[in-house]
């Protein structure tokens, strides 16, 4: 639906070419220091039109916080964030034509009506709401020294050979394409521009790490931390697969290779990706996310119109040649939301926690 989370919950609203995109965050505890500059920084990292590796649609994406914050701190009431759309160009979209590999076809057959302008609700423009909610989640996580970092480790046929521990998040922070490998940053850029010049698009791969996760986060059996992360990330536009820890590679291993042995309270490896039995074990939570190529390309393609007629169309509009670049910011936000939700849920997981909250320790 349009909401995500149990205790830390957000609801998003708005369409690509509507008046605004926004979200309402419910469950944020009172007393968390609110950092508006950080919120805007996260939105700026996601916003379009920053360079030639992104869509040429330029939006300022300035956040307006309408409620839930007073004198620099959260009040415990719903926090609403609004971002206005200021640079729409709806004439680029045809009302009766299904764009290949887009949600046009499925939305129409589900609802019998669709907002065709820029993909409407199915547009990645909606991810503004996710990034805003994720920024609030990170403000909460910061109070517990939990840090979430993401970047791009592969574009097209080019993959970094660095290990998870060797990825350079400082490089990603300063890179136009959020590259985790300085030696491949230019190759990533070249690959994107090559696809763009050919009127095509290209896929990408993102790595996310949660540092300092508290042990015990996750709600088995049906709200396991890894299943919630998969749920959250697979809901991001253009994501087709994720891996946690060794992921697919673990299916090629023996148990003796895949098991993370424990000595003196420390795991000697991290094939599990920091999660055992759906619960965090205190190690790094390592996630890889795989983005398909942006479906909006400028080559002739076969499709159909609403009347069922076969037609050939070249798309118009302004689109990312590689959606995974800005998508890395959205994945980071959704991981933060999952971790904040798990943190709050865990507060009532046992009697001792509740006794500490209410000063009833025996």
Swiss-Prot record:
Stored InterPro entries: Chorismate_synth (IPR000453), Chorismate_synth_AroC_sf (IPR035904), Chorismate_synthase_CS (IPR020541)
Pathway assigned to this chain's UniProt record: Metabolic intermediate biosynthesis; chorismate biosynthesis; chorismate from D-erythrose 4-phosphate and phosphoenolpyruvate: step 7/7
Top-level EC class as recorded in UniProt: lyase
Binding site for NADP(+): 46
Enzyme Commission numbers on file: 4.2.3.5
Annotated disulfide bonds: none
GO cellular component: cytosol
Amino-acid positions noted as binding FMN in the UniProt annotation, renumbered to this chain: 121-123, 237-238, 277, 292-296, 318
Quaternary organization: Homotetramer.
A Pfam family recorded for this sequence: Chorismate_synt
Family label: Belongs to the chorismate synthase family.
Keyword Transport part of the UniProt annotation: no
HAMAP family the record matches: Chorismate_synth
Functional description taken from the UniProt entry: This reaction introduces a second double bond into the aromatic ring system.
GO molecular function term, any single one: FMN binding
Catalytic reaction annotation: 5-O-(1-carboxyvinyl)-3-phosphoshikimate = chorismate + phosphate
Protein keywords: Amino-acid biosynthesis, Aromatic amino acid biosynthesis, FAD, Flavoprotein, FMN, Lyase, NADP
Necessary cofactors: FMNH2
Name of the protein in its database record: Chorismate synthase
Cofactor note text: Reduced FMN (FMNH(2)).
Biological process, per Gene Ontology: amino acid biosynthetic process; aromatic amino acid family biosynthetic process; chorismate biosynthetic process
């Amino acid at each position: 639906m349009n909401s995500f989370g149990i205790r830390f919950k957000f609801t998003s609203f708005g369409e690509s070419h509507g008046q605004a995109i926004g979200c309402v965050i419910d469950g944020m505890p009172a007393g968390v220091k609110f950092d508006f500059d950080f919120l805007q920084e996260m939105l700026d990292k996601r916003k379009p039109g920053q360079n030639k590796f992104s869509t040429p649609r330029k939006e300022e994406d300035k956040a307006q916080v309408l409620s839930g914050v007073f004198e620099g701190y959260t009040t415990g009431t719903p926090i609403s964030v609004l971002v206005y759309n200021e640079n729409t160009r709806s004439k680029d979209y045809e009302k009766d034509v299904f764009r290949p590999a887009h949600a046009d076809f499925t939305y129409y057959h589900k609802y019998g009506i669709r907002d065709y302008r820029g993909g409407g609700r199915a547009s990645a423009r909606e991810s503004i709401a996710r990034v805003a909610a994720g920024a609030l989640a990170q403000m909460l996580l910061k109070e517990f020294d939990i840090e979430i970092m993401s970047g791009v480790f592969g574009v097209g046929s080019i993959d970094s050979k660095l290990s998870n521990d060797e990825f350079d998040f400082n490089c990603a922070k300063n890179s136009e394409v959020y590259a985790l490998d300085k030696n491949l940053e230019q190759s990533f850029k070249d690959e994107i521009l090559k696809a763009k010049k050919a009127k095509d698009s290209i896929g990408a791969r993102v790595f996310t790490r949660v540092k300092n996760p508290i042990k015990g986060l996750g709600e088995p059996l049906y709200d396991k931390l890894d299943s919630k992360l998969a749920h959250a990330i697979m809901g991001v536009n253009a994501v087709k697969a994720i891996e946690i820890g060794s992921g697919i590679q673990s299916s090629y291993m023996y148990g003796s290779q895949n098991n993370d042995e424990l000595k003196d309270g420390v795991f000697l490896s991290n094939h599990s990706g920091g999660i055992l039995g759906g619960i965090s074990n205190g190690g790094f939570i390592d996630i890889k996310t795989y983005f398909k190529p942006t479906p909006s390309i400028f080559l002739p393609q076969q499709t159909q119109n609403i009347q069922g007629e076969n037609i050939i169309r070249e798309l118009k509009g302004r689109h990312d040649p590689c959606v995974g670049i800005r998508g890395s910011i959205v994945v980071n936000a959704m991981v933060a939301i999952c971790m904040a939700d798990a943190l709050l849920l865990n507060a009532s997981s046992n009697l001792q926690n509740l006794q500490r909250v209410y000063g009833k320790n025996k």
